[in-house]
Amino acid sequence: MRVLPLPLLIALGFPAAALAGNQTADCMAQATTPAEQLACVGKSSEACRSHLVDAQPALVAGCITDEVGWWRHRLMDAEAAMQARAEKLDVPYTKQIAEGAPRLTDDFEAMRKAWASWAEKRCTFEAMAHRNSPRRMVYAIDCHLHLTAEQALYLEAAAKGK
């Protein structure tokens, strides 16, 4: 039996809170430095939460889950861009690779999988650290929000050679 990741379980359980206006995207469009980009993380979920009449943990988690989805799309695009860059960076080493040298594309895939596993474990730990709190799912999904956003921003920069 496969266990679904926590963010997916949360996303399936709640209707989309609608990122109307998407404050995170608006903020990112204006951000010019890595610090400004990091400051954008959570803008849409904060706006969503500000409209909640009853800030029950499940509703708050739903707001955060919507933004996690936005960052996951960015992360997927960043992964594709980094994969393309890794393929180009491997080209000058074709001879060495044929002789057994490692490929950057293989290293990138290993890193991507390890990061996904680590992020899931890290955020599960965050939830368990608050297991007596009704807000434990909020802690877990907020962890996913920040880790996903940070990884997306890292890979976007890496794909550009920064």
UniProtKB/Swiss-Prot annotation:
Query: Per its UniProt record, what InterPro entries does this chain match?
Result: LprI-like_N
The UniProt entry, under Pfam families, shows: LprI
UniProt cross-references to Gene3D superfamilies, sorted A to Z: 1.20.1270.180
Q: What is this protein called?
A: Uncharacterized 17.7 kDa protein in puhA 5'region
Its taxonomic placement starts with: Bacteria, Pseudomonadati, Pseudomonadota, Alphaproteobacteria, Rhodobacterales
